[in-house]
């Protein structure tokens, strides 16, 4: 389980600090698929970097903490990352938590065969076992995830984009971590390959019983595979709840507009997009940051920021219209 406690994060720039995350507060439960959605530039990938504790300059934690609890050899362990303990969660990388980065098919080392890259991962985290043991385990695991064994002898450029993506996912899940983060795992892949990647992630999560966190701007991806989801806008979480409930009755005006923009089978009409774009985080508007684009905005929306509160059992949102 992971608990995100009122996290704010900023980017250091030559003109000053830019607050990229503002007071994000939620939890990721054991054995669930959790989605993080929103337009480009809303802070999804930045949030994932904070959760995975890969905050390198110019990104740094401004406030709050991230707590990770996981099982290790039958013992429940707890790690914390905050301003006093930077890098606290990094000790659990790959063993307890793993990360499939955006454009993952491009992260493989082009001058090493796939088997050598698996071995490097294995050597760093299973030092007591040799290369022969690694080969045996990798071959068995490739069979489990539906990858042919001959990919081990291949260089990355010899594989298709979809196959490279599968290899990276296989590496990220090879040590059976308790939590997996996937940042836009279907980007730049055709629709057929996208379906295969999502199916692979779902099957691995069901088999391992771990938590899977999916970041995607594609609401259709979240509808297909997530149990719960959070909607990000301008660095803040504006809605959170069970995925089925969010799609059936979205609470926040931004979520409503996102869902209305989705195409439907048999629909011959034009879909309605969301006018404008996310605000410049260097100079965000006062009050609710969505107010300039919201057709239901009231004067109070531009005067004070709404609090992220539980509106219904298990459902949270940040909107003045819901707090009346």
Q: In which residue ranges do the predicted regions lie?
A:
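A short, proline-enriched helix->beta-strand linker immediately N-terminal to the Walker B motif
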Residues: 174-178
């Amino acid at each position: 389980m992971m608990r995100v406690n009122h996290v704010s994060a900023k980017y250091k720039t030559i003109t000053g600090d830019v607050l990229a995350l503002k007071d994000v507060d939620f939890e990721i439960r054991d054995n669930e698929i959790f989605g993080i959605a929103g337009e480009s530039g809303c802070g999804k990938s930045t949030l994932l970097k904070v959760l995975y504790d890969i905050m390198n300059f110019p990104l740094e934690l401004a406030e709050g903490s991230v707590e990770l609890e996981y099982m290790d050899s039958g013992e429940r362990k707890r790690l914390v990352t905050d301003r006093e303990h930077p890098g606290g969660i990094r000790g659990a990388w790959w063993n307890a938590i793993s990360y499939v980065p955006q454009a993952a098919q491009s992260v493989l080392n082009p001058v090493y065969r796939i088997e050598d890259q698996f071995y490097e991962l294995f050597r760093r985290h299973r030092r007591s076992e040799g290369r022969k043991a690694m080969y045996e385990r990798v071959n068995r695991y490739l069979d489990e995830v539906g990858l042919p064994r001959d990919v081990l002898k291949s260089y990355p450029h010899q594989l298709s984009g979809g196959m490279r993506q599968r290899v990276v996912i296989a590496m990220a899940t090879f040590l059976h971590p308790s939590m997996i983060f996937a940042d836009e795992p279907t980007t730049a892949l055709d629709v057929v390959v996208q379906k295969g990647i999502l199916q692979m992630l779902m099957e691995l999560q069901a088999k391992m019983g771990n938590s899977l966190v999916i970041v995607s701007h594609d609401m259709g991806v979240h509808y297909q595979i997530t149990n719960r989801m959070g909607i990000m806008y301008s660095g803040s979480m504006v809605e959170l709840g069970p995925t089925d409930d969010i799609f059936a009755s979205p609470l926040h005006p931004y979520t409503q507009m996102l869902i209305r923009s989705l195409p439907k089978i048999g629909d011959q009409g034009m879909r309605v997009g969301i006018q404008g774009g996310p605000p410049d985080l260097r100079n965000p508007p006062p009050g609710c940051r969505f107010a300039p684009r919201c057709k239901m905005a009231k004067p109070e929306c531009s005067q004070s920021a709404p609090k992220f509160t539980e509106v219904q059992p298990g459902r949270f949102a940040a909107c003045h219209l819901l707090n009346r």
